[in-house]
Design a protein with these regions (language model features):
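N-terminal intrinsically disordered/low-complexity leader segments
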Residues: 1-16, 27
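Amphipathic alpha-helical packing segments from all-alpha helical-bundle domains
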Residues: 124-149, 157-161, 186-194
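Generic hydrophobic, amphipathic alpha-helix propensity
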Residues: 17-26, 42, 67-75, 79, ...
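Amphipathic alpha-helical linker/stalk segments
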Residues: 67-94, 124-133
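Helix-turn-helix
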Residues: 20, 24, 28-62, 66
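Conserved hydrophobic residue
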Residues: 34, 152, 179-180
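Helical hydrophobic small-molecule/effector-binding pocket
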Residues: 94-116, 129, 164
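Amphipathic C-terminal alpha-helical segment
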Residues: 113, 141, 145-146, 163-182, ...
């Protein structure tokens, strides 16, 4: 018996399915963790045959990298948009802090996947690493501008890492429901970015 030839997918069809699959996989990875998701479970979520995802993704690792890449792309775009047209370094830092918090609260699944789940070894997925670097670059640039303007002292890369660690810690505590000692997330983030010189 002669098998039926598989239809050749257009670039648009591949892109549309991948976008739908990445959105569904984001929810699944956030709910079940990395080990709790398979391409077959994704197929069930999407209502397609068990083998359909294999036409679009080589394996689960590739799917996960695409989920994280897309999350970092949206996050980086939010950081970029937050400082568009802003020239004052201190204002840029403040707006970046607000954008960071807004993204984490609006997209907790994506935020969890970006920073909390299993990470691939460096050099495995260049596109993912490029978006990660871009998302950090806006904070680094704002800190460097603050150093250049005499508002901050010291190494800009180190200071940017300190600020990132501070806000990430605050946001993570908030999302876990553990900021319960009398200070709100907004108050604490405002303190971090109103007085970035406190980060040593």
């Amino acid at each position: 018996m002669v098998g039926v030839a598989r239809a050749v997918l257009t670039v648009e069809e591949v892109g549309a399915f991948r976008a739908k699959a990445v959105a569904a996989a984001t929810r699944l990875f956030a709910e079940r963790g990395y080990r709790g998701v398979t391409l077959r479970s994704l197929a069930k979520e999407l209502g397609v045959s068990p083998m359909t995802p294999y036409r679009y993704f080589e394996n689960k690792e590739e799917l996960f990298s695409m989920v994280r890449t897309e999350a970092f792309r949206r996050f980086a775009d939010a950081q970029r948009d937050a400082v568009a047209g802003i020239t004052a370094p201190k204002d840029a830092l403040r707006m970046l802090g607000r954008a960071y918090v807004s993204f984490a609260i609006d997209e907790p699944d994506a935020y969890h996947i970006m920073f909390e789940l299993l990470q691939a070894p460096a050099g495995t997925y260049p596109e993912l690493e490029a978006e990660q670097a871009r998302s950090f670059s806006y904070l680094h640039e704002a800190v460097q501008a603050s150093v250049d303007a005499g508002l901050l002292e010291g190494d800009s890369l180190r200071r940017a890492h300190y600020l990132w660690a501070q806000i990430h810690g605050l946001v993570s505590l908030h999302l876990a429901g553990k900021l319960v000692m009398g200070c709100s997330l907004e108050e604490l983030v405002s303190t971090v970015f109103e007085k970035p010189e406190a980060a040593q």
